[in-house]
Design a protein with these regions (language model features):
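Conserved GNAT acetyl-CoA-binding A-motif
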Residues: 23-36, 169-179
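Non-catalytic interaction/regulatory modules that flank or connect domains
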Residues: 105-200, 205
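Conserved acetyl-CoA-binding loop-helix of GNAT-fold acetyltransferases
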Residues: 2, 8-23, 30-33, 48, ...
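Conserved active-site tyrosine of GNAT-family acetyltransferases
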Residues: 42-46, 192
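Conserved beta-strand-loop-alpha-helix junction that forms the acyl-donor binding cleft
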Residues: 33-43, 52, 60-61, 176-185
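C-terminal "cap" of GNAT-fold acetyltransferases
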Residues: 61-96, 208-234
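Conserved catalytic-core motifs of GNAT/GCN5-like acyltransferases
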Residues: 32-34, 50-72, 198-210
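Short, cationic low-complexity segments
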Residues: 95-126, 227-250
Length: 250
């Protein structure tokens, strides 16, 4: 936390700008940040320094965190992913799920990255015999991350088996990261949503060159009135996500 007598001097903004310049000199292609939604200060600073919002992950942090001068959150805390391109990105050639195509295109427009939606022929998708997953359990926040590296014929069954294991451990939520560069993502997304996953957003260079983020909440109904976002685009994303959240009426 910043000392009260040091606040309002733009120190955080200066530090973030220095970080951005250092990363650019080191040849990095982009940076991403995650601002909590208990307040909008970090989101605002990120936007001021050129970061643009691209995903909202709900209830990913425990509610026991204390924010000086702002109290303790009532519920688990959500975060806003934002991304800053440090170089000119080549056009993103991706396979977005058809029902989220406009939403994902809006995200890339917000990031000022050109994209093209590639057609996907479900009948000609090549699947491996077995899927390749990586599961990371995050005990400090009681969450889990799943990265799906390769789609196999067992993708649905393997994901269901993994979910069963995680829910048995009473994990509060799961983030599922999918490769938008794989045609199978366009097809399997809706199948994963039938299991209770729903959209969070999309971001470049996180696990994959272009990543689709889905999320799953374990019997948690977010209080959307307590989720504070700074940018107009984040507000439109939040409404889109809320409309597709199967937990909103729990």
């Amino acid at each position: 936390a910043t000392k009260p007598d040091c606040r309002g001097q733009g120190i955080f903004t200066q530090m973030l700008n220095l970080l951005n310049e250092t990363a650019k000199k080191q040849g990095m292609q982009g940076l991403y940040g995650r601002g909590v939604t208990f307040h909008t200060f970090s989101q605002k600073t990120g936007n001021t320094c050129g970061y643009r919002d691209c995903a909202i992950t709900l209830c990913v942090l425990p509610a026991d965190r204390v924010y000086k001068g702002m109290g303790i959150p009532k519920d688990r805390i959500s975060t806003v992913y934002s991304y800053l391109p440090l170089v000119r990105h080549e056009k993103a050639a991706i396979y977005p799920p058809r029902h989220h195509s406009a939403f994902i295109e809006g995200i890339y427009n917000n990031l000022s990255i050109d994209m093209i939606s590639l057609p996907c022929d479900e009948k000609n998708i090549q699947l491996q015999q077995q899927s390749s997953f990586k599961v990371d359990i995050l005990p400090n926040v009681n969450m889990a991350d799943i990265k799906l590296y390769a789609y196999g014929r067992d993708a649905i069954d393997k994901l269901m088996e993994t979910m069963k294991m995680l829910l048995k451990r009473k994990i509060d939520g799961i983030s599922l990261y999918l490769d938008l560069g794989q045609p199978a993502t366009a097809i399997f997304c809706s199948e994963f949503e039938k299991l209770g996953f729903f959209i969070a957003g999309a971001i470049p260079l996180l696990y994959f060159r272009n990543t689709l983020i889905l999320q799953y909440l374990n019997n948690i109904s977010p209080d959307y009135s307590e989720i504070r976002v700074y940018s107009d685009f984040a507000r439109s994303m939040l409404e889109y996500i809320r409309e597709r959240d199967p937990n909103r009426d729990l």
